[in-house]
Design a protein with these regions (language model features):
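Central antiparallel beta-sheet cores of small beta-barrel/beta-sandwich binding domains
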Residues: 28-106, 118, 170
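N-terminal cap/lid segment of alpha/beta-hydrolase-fold proteins
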Residues: 51, 130-166
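Short, surface-exposed "cap/lid" segments of acyl-processing enzymes
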Residues: 164-205
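Alpha/beta-hydrolase active-site loop
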Residues: 195, 228-250
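Primarily recognizes the serine-hydrolase "nucleophile elbow" in alpha/beta-hydrolase
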Residues: 245-299
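Accessory cap/linker subdomain of secreted extracellular hydrolases
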Residues: 279-353
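Short beta-strand/loop motif that positions the catalytic acidic residue
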Residues: 357, 363-365
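Short alpha-helix in the alpha/beta-hydrolase fold that links the catalytic acid
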Residues: 359, 372-383
């Protein structure tokens, strides 16, 4: 039986793990819903998610006075035109149609909130949208939009520069795992932390430029989204390397470094190895290959039988072999379409990569990081004897000061008002200054 066209893919947790689901066949629209000429009552940008169990799917809907668009960032769907929008008092219906197949949203408008039911192919899930204020919609990123050339196409980024004329050093900031944007926010998690945006702005204030970018398939780089089975870890490395090459050609920059956060640390190591990078900084980077990281995480979640099966699958993947038959309970992690990416990812060992770097290296971690424990940083530092190690008290995985309890720690992941953890920026600046990676008029020099 031929599988219907796939529209929605869900990325889970930290492993760019996607699960496909099929389009809903055309449904009859309630005849009582009357189409109106103006949708001014709901005009504007609305953000929220489809509440799929354990895997909320972020969506963005923009209504105009006559129609609208929908974006599903995880899928790479950007401002796709709505087929119809119908409003009757507080009852709202809108849909999209692709290849003559339909997805529907039906709900109620309650001032600044829309809630209702999303339906496709006989499956229904709740959805909720919140209206963005005019101030939020109008808010623009500071900095200069830039593009780097790839083997196929271009990748977009944001250049943040100091106020002085330069030349100044520039740091390529690489985001962590999953569907993460240039500011450090994961679209699969409601709310923002803006940690990488804060880092870029703080560096600019101290005379250090930076380039940060949405990962391929996310935000400004949705155009780079491809089929899941075609994704390879090397593509992320090539993206980072392209930014190094871009910066090397720009006369505004005196030196070029890389700052990699979480998975971005591994990507950054590999990119630094293949380019003429002057310095490398790891923020909350793992100290072991992803298969070992996965086993530790799965040990806390799976039954003994499922854990054994997971280990067997990982053994095969490490040998470059795909596993076609996967238990339904493990499908979201090990489905066949994601296995080529995992095979390519497992190939990279941060312990081996960090030893091969011939440039100054700073390894940073927080002692309240519940995703990547400080012993990872210590392991990297041990292998790279001439590296510098910085363990920051009370700092967690999103680079914020966090309480000791898990719930309070996780709450910082969605609070953009919290500043970066004290000691992070100064620690980075001291390291850069020590290795002469500073602006001409840097006050620390």
């Amino acid at each position: 039986m031929k599988r219907p066209f796939t529209i929605i893919c869900i990325i889970v947790s930290a492993f760019v793990l996607m699960a496909g689901c099929r389009i809903k066949e055309a449904e009859q629209v309630d005849e009582n819903l009357k189409e109106v000429s103006s949708l001014k009552d709901i005009e504007g940008k609305w953000e929220g998610d489809i509440k799929i169990p354990n895997q909320p799917l972020p969506i963005i809907v923009h209504f105009t006075k006559e129609d609208g668009t929908i974006s599903i960032p995880v899928q790479g769907l950007n401002e796709f035109p709505l087929t119809s929008v119908k409003l009757s008092k507080s009852d709202l219906f809108f849909d999209i149609k692709i290849q003559n197949q339909q997805i529907t949203f039906e709900g109620k408008v309650d001032q600044e909130k829309i809630s209702g039911t999303f339906a496709q192919n006989g499956q229904e899930y709740p959805f909720e949208l919140l209206k963005k204020s005019n101030q939020e919609v109008a808010e623009k990123e500071s900095g200069e939009v830039v593009q780097a050339d790839l083997k196929k196409g271009t990748i977009n980024g944001l250049l943040e520069t100091p106020k002085n004329e330069g030349p100044f050093p520039v740091m390529i900031i690489i985001a962590g795992s999953g569907p993460t944007d240039k500011d450090g926010n994961t679209i699969a998690i409601p709310g923002k932390n803006n940690s990488l945006k804060m880092l870029a702005e703080s560096l600019a204030e101290k005379g250090i430029a930076s380039i940060r970018y949405d990962k391929r398939g996310i935000g400004e780089n949705m155009k780079l989204a491809g089929k899941e089975e075609d994704l390879r870890f090397e593509q992320y490395i090539d993206d980072a390397a392209a930014w190094v090459q871009f910066a090397k050609k720009d006369r505004r920059f005196s030196k070029v470094g890389i700052i990699g956060h979480s998975e971005g640390s591994l990507i950054g190591m590999a990119a630094a190895k293949k380019t003429e990078t002057d310095i490398f900084i790891s923020l909350a980077g793992a100290g072991e290959p992803i298969d070992q990281v996965l086993v530790k995480q799965l040990e806390e979640q799976l039954t003994p039988a499922l854990l054994t099966e997971s280990k067997d699958i990982l053994t095969n993947l490490k040998q470059g072999k795909q596993v076609e038959s996967v238990n339904a309970d493990l499908y979201s992690v090990f489905r066949p379409s994601v296995q080529p990416y995992m095979i390519s990812w497992i190939h990279y060992n941060p312990i081996e990569l960090v030893k091969e770097l011939k440039i100054p290296v700073l390894i940073v971690n927080g002692n309240r990081d519940i995703q990547v424990a400080p012993n990872n940083a210590k392991a990297l530092h041990k292998e790279k004897g001439d590296s510098e190690l910085l363990i920051i008290e009370k700092m967690n995985h999103v680079l914020k000061e966090a309480p000791a309890d898990r719930e309070g720690n996780l709450a910082t992941y969605t609070n953009p008002e919290l500043p970066l953890s004290p000691g992070l920026v100064n620690g980075i600046l001291e390291f850069l200054n020590k290795h002469d990676i500073t602006s001409n008029d840097d006050p620390l020099k």
